């Protein structure tokens, strides 16, 4: 898919090209957990909120199968249409390759138009010299991806104007509290949005969201500050690979939301889950928890026992 946009695509003589469609796989753990006496306590709203489904069932639900097939088909159709346009191969042929051929040796890939040539690595210098109109004995000048990206970053860091557009990256799961390297801390980001709202040199904000969601509370904290920010200046959200659940929640206040054609977004709903280990301790390890409490539900949420019906309704 990525290679197809190139003017020319080459493959090593001992290479292989694979073309086999898309798949999504998950493991369902209901019986495995029961075997060990582990009881998941799950509260879920929304039949398409499927993240907790593997802990509840042994089979995929119809709703989850439907949504998974929908987004896989959407991604696949976009991919083959793009490849078809770039390589001048019909979508029917590309689907046939995925269904019946799957693997292509170099000659086969060239015959059907997936590649343009077959070369060893040492032959590529000569190919590139010819492609760029140079003499075959000239030295090929190249730049590494690292050096090129470093140069671009240096150019982007130039501060040339008193009027600025702020770019904020919100990447990772959404957690309560402060930011860390792999998560979006609700309090930390709310403070960033507050500062941007107050900064008169910032004329607009672009929020790049790449998040599967997380804490509903942290999402609400950020949503509030983003709503206040939008009242003062334009707010644009750019979605990355995914902006699901809380990731969509924090995107909602934007004046405009922009996605890539393959962004996965939605998953609007809530769930809560924790495991209880009372049966594991009693029946497998001969450990017997005992509790003393002042009221019937003083130990609600204990990992030693499941929720009762009243507590489930409360949740």
Placement of each model-derived feature along the sequence:
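Small-residue-centered hinge/linker elements
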Residues: 1-90, 95-96, 103, 129-234, ...
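Short, contiguous alpha-helical
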Residues: 109
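Terminal amphipathic helices with adjacent charged low-complexity linkers/tails
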Residues: 117, 125-131
